[in-house]
């Protein structure tokens, strides 16, 4: 008689699974793969609740988020260096977003970022 199927882990979940080595008996941890998959999935469900995403598309979205993050971080770092500052503040991030993103997209990103920072500071 076939065994009942176990429930699959949530998409994008990151768990360190321990495996036992054959001869040595020592436990080995599987390396964690960090990704934005769970966050991309949450946003997708907010925008289109009945739509799914393939693993290939999720990989592309993960690469996209990593790329944008690196660009904003790099530009923010450059701005802080130009102004002889050792700290990247929300002001540097905002300016970097304005420089990197075109027109209306930058305006929306800045307003969403401001909203997120306001929500965070009010919750403290």
From Swiss-Prot:
Residues annotated as carrying N6-acetyllysine in the record are: 6, 11, 14, 19
The record's annotation in InterPro entries points to: Histone-fold, Histone_H2A/H2B/H3, Histone_H2B, HISTONE_H2B_site
Q: Where in the cell is it found?
A: Nucleus; Chromosome
* Signal peptide positions on this chain: none
Q: Which UniProt keywords apply?
A: Acetylation, Chromosome, DNA-binding, Glycoprotein, Isopeptide bond, Nucleosome core, Nucleus, Phosphoprotein, Ubl conjugation
Q: What residues are glycosylation sites in this protein?
A: 111
Cysteine disulfide links: none
Subunit info here reads: The nucleosome is a histone octamer containing two molecules each of H2A, H2B, H3 and H4 assembled in one H3-H4 heterotetramer and two H2A-H2B heterodimers. The octamer wraps approximately 147 bp of DNA.
Q: What does this protein do?
A: Core component of nucleosome. Nucleosomes wrap and compact DNA into chromatin, limiting DNA accessibility to the cellular machineries which require DNA as a template. Histones thereby play a central role in transcription regulation, DNA repair, DNA replication and chromosomal stability. DNA accessibility is regulated via a complex set of post-translational modifications of histones, also called histone code, and nucleosome remodeling.
Q: Which intervals of the chain are annotated as region Disordered?
A: 1-33
Q: What's this protein's name?
A: Histone H2B
Q: Name one GO cellular component term.
A: nucleus
Which Gene Ontology terms cover its molecular function?
Answer: DNA binding; protein heterodimerization activity; structural constituent of chromatin
Recount the PTM note.
Answer: Monoubiquitination of Lys-119 by BRE1 gives a specific tag for epigenetic transcriptional activation and is also prerequisite for histone H3 'Lys-4' and 'Lys-79' methylation. Phosphorylated during apoptosis; which facilitates apoptotic chromatin condensation.
Top-rank taxon, per record: Eukaryota
Gene3D superfamilies with a match to the protein in the record: Histone, subunit A (1.10.20.10)
């Amino acid at each position: 008689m076939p065994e009942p199927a176990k429930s699959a882990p949530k998409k994008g979940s990151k768990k360190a699974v321990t495996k036992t080595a054959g001869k040595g008996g020592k436990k080995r941890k599987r390396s964690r793969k960090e990704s934005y998959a769970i966050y991309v999935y949450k946003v997708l469900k907010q925008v289109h609740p009945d739509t799914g995403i393939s693993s290939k598309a999720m990989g592309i979205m993960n690469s996209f988020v990593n790329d944008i993050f690196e660009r904003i971080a790099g530009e923010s770092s450059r701005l802080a260096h130009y102004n002889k500052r050792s700290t990247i503040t929300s002001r540097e991030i905002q300016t970097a977003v304005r420089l990197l993103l075109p027109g209306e997209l930058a305006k929306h990103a800045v307003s969403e970022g401001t909203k997120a920072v306001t929500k965070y500071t009010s919750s403290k």
